[in-house]
């Protein structure tokens, strides 16, 4: 028998996609990632346009400015994502559940860290300095971080990384600690967003809770908490 194969240490990747829109099936038009170490130092980065093999919705084009002509000669998602394959990856990003719905099937995902969930947990506005929502641009402005080509994949990966660094620094946390904590879902007690924001989860209408679960675009903490309330 040959010698046992050693476990491969997962890569740490901050990832973002720009897409064809929100209508399924959703395609990727731009893919970017920044590979980091546990000290959140950048090791390398990657950015490419992607041929989604479907039409780009006008609303999506209005956000990222990527046209059908721009992606006509670009690699497909299966081709573009190959450099991340062949090893497990911890995937980090803002609302990373959305990106993983699209690209997760191409990856060996060891775990994920969502900066949207971290911002909801740790960032609190005040009457003098309100935090209106937890969108990436809003959080960046709230933290006085530099604007890095918003709504383009590589710019958003660097902004997500800066948000991660800032939250961890301000709260005395390490990436290693966050990864270990994120491995287990956190039980939420109040609705973090939307028309029922701030309401005790058990008081949110059952139909709305089930609709959220069916939408399939939730961070793991909220999905776990909703399923605890309604195991069916």
Residue ranges and their predicted role:
Residues 121, 142, 163-170:
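Active-site catalytic microenvironments for nucleophilic, acid-base chemistry
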Residues 1-7, 165-232:
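Acidic two-metal-ion nuclease catalytic site recognized across multiple nuclease folds
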Residues 1-112, 117-120, 124-151:
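Conserved non-catalytic scaffold segment of RNase H-like nuclease domains
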Residues 152-165:
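Acidic, divalent-metal-coordinating active-site segment for phosphoryl/phosphodiester hydrolysis
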Residues 115, 157-160, 205, 209:
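Short runs of predominantly hydrophobic/aromatic residues within well-ordered alpha helices
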Residues 150-153, 173-175:
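Short, charged, surface-exposed loops that flank catalytic or proteolytic processing sites
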């Amino acid at each position: 028998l040959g010698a046992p194969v050693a476990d491969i240490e997962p890569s740490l990747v901050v990832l973002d996609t720009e897409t064809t829109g929100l209508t399924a099936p959703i395609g990727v038009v731009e893919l970017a990632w920044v590979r980091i170490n546990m000290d959140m130092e950048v090791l390398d980065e990657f950015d490419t346009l992607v041929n989604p093999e479907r039409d780009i919705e006008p609303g999506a084009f209005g956000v990222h400015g990527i046209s059908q002509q721009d992606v006509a000669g670009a690699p497909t998602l299966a081709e573009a994502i190959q450099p991340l394959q062949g090893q497990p990856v911890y995937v980090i990003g803002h609302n990373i559940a959305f990106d993983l719905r699209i690209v997760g099937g191409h990856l060996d995902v060891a775990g994920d860290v969502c900066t949207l969930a971290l911002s909801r947990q740790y960032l609190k506005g005040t009457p003098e300095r309100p935090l209106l929502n937890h969108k990436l641009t809003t959080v960046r402005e709230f933290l006085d971080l530099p604007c890095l080509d918003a709504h383009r994949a590589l710019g958003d990966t660097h902004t997500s990384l800066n948000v991660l660094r800032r939250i961890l620094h301000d709260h005395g946390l390490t990436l290693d600690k966050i990864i270990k904590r994120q491995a287990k879902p956190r039980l939420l007690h109040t609705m973090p967003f939307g028309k029922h924001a701030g309401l005790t989860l058990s008081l949110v209408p059952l139909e709305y809770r089930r609709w959220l679960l069916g939408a399939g675009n939730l961070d793991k903490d909220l999905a776990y908490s909703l399923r605890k309330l309604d195991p069916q």
